[in-house]
Amino acid sequence: MMYHIPGVLSPQDVAHFREQLEQAEWVDGRVTTGAQGAQVKNNQQVDTRSALYAALQNEVLNAVNQHALFFAAALPRTLSTPLFNRYQNNETYGFHVDGAVRSHPQNGWMRTDLSATLFLSDPQSYDGGELVVNDTFGQHRVKLPAGDLVLYPSSSLHCVTPVTRGVRVASFMWIQSMIRDDKKRAMLFELDKNIQSLKSRYGENEEILSLLNLYHNLLREWSEI
């Protein structure tokens, strides 16, 4: 399943990131991809050796970790170190699949269950640059407001279409979920959303408590910690 997570960054946060990224050192984006991806990848990424990068990636992690909807949808166990990319002048990233595992500075290795793109450019400021994701439900074309994030299964073929005008800047990362199976994770998310909706309408009651108990028992049964 694909999920739109709005408002991960405020407009003020987005402006801060854009200002900081204007000062960043950008390198060939192929430095962080494997042989297959390098054949179709043509973009730029912030140099991960810089102090500016270290500060900005930490700010992204803080933002997503504090966002309740992101947590409910992803049920994250491990987040990769966020990266930053930039597309301009017809740069693109052809169809590819993300690697199943990635190295992690604290955990050694992590499994990539979900991929996330956090948009940092106003969609009206550039042409093209759509994230295109192919999954079992068809093809999805994504171009979100700055500050919004999209989550999708890392097993999906996806690409970024050429940016023919302006500049598209984003942060991206991978998530190892506590729930490995996409279908089980989706069921838990739907159950959680409905519990929260019922609580907002009716307050706490025995039926809602029973559903909450069901949610946590399923999470306990299915989670890998």
Curated annotation (Swiss-Prot):
Binding site for 2-oxoglutarate: 168
Keyword ATP-binding assigned: no
Enzyme class: oxidoreductase
Coiled coil: none
Cofactor note: Binds 1 Fe(2+) ion per subunit.
Cystines in this chain: none
Cofactor annotation: Fe(2+); L-ascorbate
Keyword Hydrolase applies: no
HAMAP family registered for this protein in UniProt: Hydroxyl_YbiX (MF_00657)
The name this protein goes by in its record: PKHD-type hydroxylase YbiX
